[in-house]
Amino acid sequence: MKVILIKDCKDGKANTIIEVSDGYGSNFLINKGFALPYNEKTKKQLEKRLSDLTANEMEMRQSALELKEKLEKESLKYELEANIDANSNLNVHGAVSTKDIVKSLVKLGYKLDKYAVQKVHLVGRGVHLIDVIVYKDIVAKLKVDIIINVK
């Protein structure tokens, strides 16, 4: 029996056609809402759904590329305080974390979740490039500039 999966399950991904035994297909997959029986009507529905998905995918990819360009033009600046101890070592107080970077990006009007930004714990001064996952395989390089004020 051929069925069209409409949800991801152990047998395959959604929107794929698989061959299963008659009992498994009708009693489990179709009954539980994981699949539809394969016929001309459902085949046309699948083709329409796949064309809609590809059109939506292209739209999302285009907007992600635009967002990548905007992010790569941005530069975030942070100031950290430091002091010099008796042994002439520089002790930096605080650090720039992923949470700080996400908050700054949200203030600038970007809509990103905390998992989109590479986990960081920046203490050293200078310009750092941070990876921001904009869309599946599209990664932007965000400039983070850290300035250390010595007291």
Curated annotation (Swiss-Prot):
Recorded GO MF terms: rRNA binding; structural constituent of ribosome
Domain of life where this protein originates: Bacteria
Pfam families per UniProt: Ribosomal_L9_C, Ribosomal_L9_N
Keyword Ribosomal protein carried by entry: yes
Cystine bridges: none
Listed GO CC annotations: ribonucleoprotein complex; ribosome
GO biological process: translation
Keywords from the UniProt entry: Ribonucleoprotein, Ribosomal protein, RNA-binding, rRNA-binding
Similarity annotation: Belongs to the bacterial ribosomal protein bL9 family.
Function: Binds to the 23S rRNA.
UniProt protein name: Large ribosomal subunit protein bL9
UniProt source species: Mycoplasmopsis agalactiae (strain NCTC 10123 / CIP 59.7 / PG2) (Mycoplasma agalactiae)
Lineage of producing organism: Bacteria, Bacillati, Mycoplasmatota, Mycoplasmoidales, Metamycoplasmataceae
